[in-house]
């Protein structure tokens, strides 16, 4: 199959094809509009977040070669909302002349944790100690691994499926060797190889987000702190506070070096552990816009979504400086129970949020709310005072996210109660009275 000439080569505005119709594709579409570009998405259904807003949609599967060909037809670049596309299919597209960015040779390092670990080891990147298991016959090796870690079979460890895990799926914390064998065997009997890793003593988790173009230009955003609960990122503080300049620079340089060594094109996230003794260890890699970069939509000169488009089209990359002393991003997750009837719709909750916190920058994905599902995020920009002590800014962000998820203010605030309309002051708006914005 011969590649169809790209739109750029015909003097037409660029077309980027993206595999996946989720929120990352939706927000990339928003960035494409501003740049005068077109984003075509491969979605599994018409009600996926990107498919609802993008006029150019292909309904199909990321595991079907013909569907991949359809979405890539005439595109200047084919890129990804997720990393689950089989690389053997991408190899065929590359052979047909399609510009796949990042390439399958790079993408496999974000798909396969064992491939990633072995390559990073060869590149000298620091990471948790690990061992690989391919068969239930190898389970006895876990005891010896635990002994090497701590001198005891009681060492706590982490068991990971080699492929397919995200947002905490496919990752389990285990108490000791016996627990590790039990968890690992569950994956192995299903034919999924596993990694067993040491559980390091953490100070916190960080993310170094960079972008790289085919020309080799790189750009790095400030290193951020990510807060995880139940394996899901719930909050990001940008930049990471109380992070020494030399450590922040080391994280950025590591991410840029890995992007170059792996041949990444596009946005590239390196998830890091900052250990209790001040070391940086690589945890995971992502080769696409990343949850830890959502703050850039309101807190940086160039958002990760615009930058991703620039990178895959080999445009000069944008500036990555922060535009506020600190930005807090908080994810809106579906609540365990539906909100009360008085605020049953997201639009009603959004109205009340803006009445109380007009400085909230809300990004909703138009997804059906389910427990724990990411349905949006909110960015709050802070001041120099907030950067010195971000507690109040973080509390406001979590308060706002809980309200959008649950329809309840955890501090007891009630917009319908007499008197409340005139007493609530937005903490981040110079003391202006929010009653001016109440209906």
UniProtKB/Swiss-Prot annotation:
Catalytic reaction annotation: 5-amino-1-(5-phospho-beta-D-ribosyl)imidazole + hydrogencarbonate + ATP = 5-carboxyamino-1-(5-phospho-D-ribosyl)imidazole + ADP + phosphate + 2 H(+)
Domain annotation ATP-grasp: ranges: 117-313
Listed PROSITE patterns: ATP_GRASP
Binding positions (ATP): 113, 160, 197-200, 205, 283-284
EC number: 6.3.4.18
Entries under PANTHER family matching the protein: PHOSPHORIBOSYLAMINOIMIDAZOLE CARBOXYLASE (PTHR11609:SF5), PURINE BIOSYNTHESIS PROTEIN 6/7, PUR6/7 (PTHR11609)
Name of the protein this chain belongs to: N5-carboxyaminoimidazole ribonucleotide synthase
Annotated organism of origin: Mycobacterium leprae (strain TN)
